[in-house]
């Protein structure tokens, strides 16, 4: 079932905040009022996952400039996130919150739970300031994501929100032309 244009469901979870080196509670209410990226991944202390999370960290400054909060989520606990952060070269670089979802509530809410393994699939969601999902990407377990494309998707989502009636075509980049759907464009693209 698609979550696009749907408000995220309620949840309460514990997260590890590497910036403050502390645990904190996170709820769906924390997503209101700003743009958010939620990056689900299968497991801590694994293989593709640290490469993805490090890549996301490499884009973190750009995401912060766009006013985007970043959260990673797995079905591990927040304690395991802290241990991973303390022992992995890649994960020790992270500045964004790592949400633990051992109850699988959030993973189920976003429909990325692999029922056979009990782990999260590789899902990335862009959530607007109203708590509504604007973009989703889910990859098979062996396929890592590229965070640089995520930055451009967020820019497009923000542009469309700020410019009602306009849409961003394929390969749209900030500063390039958008489209205004209407009868005058039918069959001309």
Curated annotation (Swiss-Prot):
It is found in: Cytoplasm. One of its GO terms (biological process) is cellular response to stress. Belongs to the peroxiredoxin family. AhpC/Prx1 subfamily. Thiol-specific peroxidase that catalyzes the reduction of hydrogen peroxide and organic hydroperoxides to water and alcohols, respectively. Plays a role in cell protection against oxidative stress by detoxifying peroxides. Pfam families: 1-cysPrx_C, AhpC-TSA. The active site is a conserved redox-active cysteine residue, the peroxidatic cysteine (C(P)), which makes the nucleophilic attack on the peroxide substrate. The peroxide oxidizes the C(P)-SH to cysteine sulfenic acid (C(P)-SOH), which then reacts with another cysteine residue, the resolving cysteine (C(R)), to form a disulfide bridge. The disulfide is subsequently reduced by an appropriate electron donor to complete the catalytic cycle. In this typical 2-Cys peroxiredoxin, C(R) is provided by the other dimeric subunit to form an intersubunit disulfide. PANTHER family: ALKYL HYDROPEROXIDE REDUCTASE C, THIOREDOXIN PEROXIDASE. GO terms for cellular component: cytosol. Its EC number is 1.11.1.26. InterPro entries: AhpC, AhpC/TSA, Peroxiredoxin, Peroxiredoxin_AhpC-typ, Peroxiredoxin_C, Thioredoxin-like_sf, Thioredoxin_domain. The gene is ahpC. This is Alkyl hydroperoxide reductase C. Keywords: Antioxidant, Cytoplasm, Disulfide bond, Oxidoreductase, Peroxidase, Redox-active center. GO terms for molecular function: NADH-dependent peroxiredoxin activity; thioredoxin peroxidase activity. It comes from the Bacteria. The active site is at 49 (cysteine sulfenic acid (-soh) intermediate).
């Amino acid at each position: 079932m698609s979550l696009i244009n749907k408000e995220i469901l309620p949840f309460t979870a514990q997260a590890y905040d590497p910036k403050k080196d502390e645990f904190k509670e996170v709820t769906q209410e924390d997503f209101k009022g700003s743009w958010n990226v939620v990056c689900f991944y299968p497991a801590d202390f694994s293989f593709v996952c640290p490469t993805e999370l490090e890549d996301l960290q490499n884009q973190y400054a750009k995401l912060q400039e766009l006013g985007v909060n970043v959260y990673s989520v797995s079905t591990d606990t927040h304690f395991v996130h802290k241990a991973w952060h303390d022992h992995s070269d890649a994960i020790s670089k992270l500045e964004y919150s790592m949400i633990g979802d051992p109850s699988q509530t959030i993973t189920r809410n976003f429909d990325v739970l692999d029922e056979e393994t009990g782990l999260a699939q590789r899902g990335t969601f862009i959530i607007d300031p109203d708590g509504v999902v604007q973009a989703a990407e889910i990859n098979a377990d062996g396929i890592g994501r590229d965070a640089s494309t995520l930055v451009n998707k967020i820019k497009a989502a923000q542009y469309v929100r700020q410019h009602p009636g306009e849409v961003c075509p394929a390969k749209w980049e900030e500063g390039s032309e958008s489209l205004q759907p209407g009868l005058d464009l039918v069959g001309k693209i």
